[in-house]
Amino acid sequence: MTNGSLVQSLRSHLAWWGLKRFTSDEAYFQWQRETLSPVEIATLLREVEQKRRGSSADEVSFYDATAGSNILPVLHSQQYDYYLAIGPRVTDRIGKARSIQSILDVGCGAGILTTFYAREHPDRRFVGIDRSSASIARATKQAQALGLTNVQFECLDLEHMPPTHFSDLVLATHVLVQAEQDPGVPSRSWNTFERAGESELQADFERRTGIGARLDHLNALLSAQGRMIVFEKTRQLARRVPLQRALAARGLGLIEQPELIRYRLVEEIADDGPFYVLGRGASRQFHWDDSPEPDEGPPFDRAKLKSGLTDPDEPLYENHWPSAQHVWEQLRDKHFLKETTKQEPDGRQLHVELGQAEEGVYLYFANTLDQRQLVLVEPARMAMLESYYQEILDSISS
């Protein structure tokens, strides 16, 4: 099946589930008000807030409460483009690997994608597991309605999955790194993107996010030549590097080049991933990349600094991306006018400097969570950068 027909098949599947695609928040919430009763909307809002602030038990409660026939399609329509991004990619990998006969979908929820995979590959066996009993009940009911006999759903926590249940492919999408607010592992210092090889920082990340224990359990469920597809919210380098190190430490290697994926959540743009296809003892053709991804920072052309200006109030150059570090390193004859470096007890650093270079007066900001900023202006406008420098210092102290 071509990718176009696969996407169309998935659209039909999502429509069967009652999902709709929206690109406008206004249109989406209008549909929500038309579809759900005031009581259902109040329940949804209450559960969303409790999930945001609560524990693992609150998260299970959220999915139990929202697995109902009316709320589920409304809630999951927000993720319509996520399904379009992940569903065809996973389905394609299953189809191309004939050695994959048994597939385990961890954190399958109500089985929206799991049932799609089972429909597209009736000759393969699928098992979906989730901690939410209501989600599993809904998934089982929907699979029966679709007449699927090659998929089953079980209400299980990953930690309680019997180690005899081996699979040729384990799917883990948005399930391993559930601590969305965790900043990750800082770099060695503010002027590098490299992470130290210290096992203590890595172990602490794996422990506080729970990824270490989850990966250990997944690895135990993988057949000898099994594969794993992982897609998490680890786009930031400080989260991507420790995830990759956790995977590599458990003998998982890259089968193909990881893919960064962008999709919409109604009006919001989500940059997620990478999308990893992994295997035990994978070839050395692909290597883990611990460097920042290419960004949208403007190119630096010394010859065009002044000639390219169209607005006299604009800086000569401005970059708020990791690539700003490379430009800062290129500035000629730099010398500090002011500088401050703050170090936290946990080793994180923040550095800001106001300086003079051949190209002009600059302000440079960097920290160990890979944020970079560089602003360059003519010497006559140095007061603007001095004010900006002080604002940063005030924000640090507060």
Feature roles, as predicted:
Residues 139-140:
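Conserved SAM-binding loop
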